Design a protein with these regions (language model features):
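Active-site pocket-lining segment
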Residues: 39-42, 78, 86, 156-172
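Flexible glycine/proline-enriched surface loops and loop-helix/loop-strand junctions
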Residues: 24-25, 46, 118-123
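Catalytic-loop motifs flanking and including active-site residues across diverse enzymes
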Residues: 33-37, 130-133, 172
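Flexible glycine-/small-residue-enriched beta->alpha junction loops
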Residues: 1-44
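Short acidic, glycine/serine/threonine-rich loops at helix termini
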Residues: 1-5, 94, 166-168
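Conserved thiamine diphosphate
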Residues: 35-59
Length: 172
């Protein structure tokens, strides 16, 4: 139950709901059969005959690129440090927590599938579950001038496109 995080559990039966999984199910429709991005990854893997080895290699390469970008400071201007206070003290979050420092192809190859029993998508080669935030301010030119805001872009046009939710990994 939602209140468990604040009040703890009481005696008796309780039902735990995975809010992330429930969110996917709600967003895609209760009867869609799609309840997680990992399931759609398995669909894409089957459709395009992508091997487990290719998935692991792509994941490894992505981790190495992210690690190199972090180490070289390329993300530093894009991340605003946030102080997180807890009973144990304060922690400054200023680095993407998703890339794993000790990722190897060997370790990736030992992970078991997590979305389908006979699948190939693992916790190591699936899209990560990351905490994060982003925002942008879109306004009129006259408002930006009035408020002395730096104009960094001009919205000329936009399009909306989508793919079959069962294959969301195909999104371009």
């Amino acid at each position: 139950p939602e209140e468990a995080r604040f009040k703890g559990f009481r005696m008796g039966d309780s039902i735990l709901i995975d809010a992330n999984d429930e969110g996917h199910r709600t967003a895609s429709g209760a009867n869609s059969g799609i309840n997680h991005m990992g399931n759609t990854a398995e669909n894409v893997v089957r459709k395009y005959n992508i091997s487990r080895e290719d998935q692991d290699k792509f994941a490894y390469d992505s981790q190495m690129k992210a690690r190199e970008a972090i180490n070289s400071g390329r993300f530093a201007k894009e991340i605003v440090p946030v102080e997180v206070k807890s009973r144990k003290g304060s922690t400054i979050v200023d680095t993407d927590g998703h890339p794993k420092k000790d990722t190897t192809l060997e370790k990736l190859s030992t992970l078991k599938p997590v979305f389908e029993k006979e699948g190939t998508v693992t916790a190591g080669n699936a899209s990560g579950l990351n905490d994060g935030a982003a925002f942008e301010i879109i306004t009129t030119l006259s408002y930006a001038k009035e408020k002395n805001l730096e104009v960094m872009a001009k919205l000329v046009d936009y399009e909306i496109a989508g793919v079959d939710p069962a294959y969301m990994g195909e999104g371009r």
